[in-house]
């Protein structure tokens, strides 16, 4: 079996982690993971990330209840990017209330909202 350990040494201890809906293939979000976040994700079966702005680990959905249940974890060929195939519980991955953090789209020079808004952040993050 091939080693399954991200290379956290390439970028100062952090690697990008992409969360993708395991059923639909929709890209939900990108966040950062350090070794501790990766270990907690594997241990608990729910996504944990590292917040660069707060300088600490965070459990996705710990405040909102919009957790990400891990179905599978993949590493890219260089072991410096993580892909999480998830079941998005609660309906939204984005702290702005949208299903996906990639909710804005530019097509033919026009910008539009392309992901449904699931909740009002003012009501969830009081």
Curated annotation (Swiss-Prot):
Enzyme class, first EC level, given as a word: hydrolase
Textual note on the cofactor: Binds 1 Mg(2+) ion per subunit. Binds 1 zinc ion per subunit.
Superkingdom, taxonomy of origin: Bacteria
InterPro entries in the record: PRA-CH, PRib_AMP_CycHydrolase_dom, PRib_AMP_CycHydrolase_sf
SUPFAM superfamilies attached to this UniProt entry: HisI-like (SSF141734)
GO CC terms, sorted: cytoplasm
Cellular location(s): Cytoplasm
Main location class: cytoplasm
Pfam entry (one): PRA-CH
Enzyme Commission number(s): 3.5.4.19
Cofactor(s) the protein requires to work: Mg(2+); Zn(2+)
GO MF annotation terms: magnesium ion binding; phosphoribosyl-AMP cyclohydrolase activity; zinc ion binding
Binding residues annotated for Zn(2+), in chain numbering: 77, 94, 101
Protein family: Belongs to the PRA-CH family.
Protein name from the UniProt record: Phosphoribosyl-AMP cyclohydrolase
Organism: Nitratidesulfovibrio vulgaris (strain ATCC 29579 / DSM 644 / CCUG 34227 / NCIMB 8303 / VKM B-1760 / Hildenborough)
Gene: hisI
């Amino acid at each position: 079996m091939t080693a399954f350990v991200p290379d956290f040494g390439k970028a100062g201890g952090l690697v990008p982690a992409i969360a993708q809906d395991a059923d639909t293939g929709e890209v939900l979000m990108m966040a950062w993971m350090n070794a501790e976040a990766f270990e907690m994700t594997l241990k608990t079966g729910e996504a944990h990330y590292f917040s660069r702005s707060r300088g600490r680990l965070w459990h996705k959905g710990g405040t909102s209840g919009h957790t990400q249940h891990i179905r599978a974890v993949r590493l890219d060929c260089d072991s410096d990017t993580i892909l999480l195939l998830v079941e998005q519980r609660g309906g939204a991955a984005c702290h702005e209330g949208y299903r996906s953090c990639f909710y804005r789209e530019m097509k033919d020079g026009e910008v539009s909202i392309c992901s449904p808004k699931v909740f009002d952040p003012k009501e969830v993050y009081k």
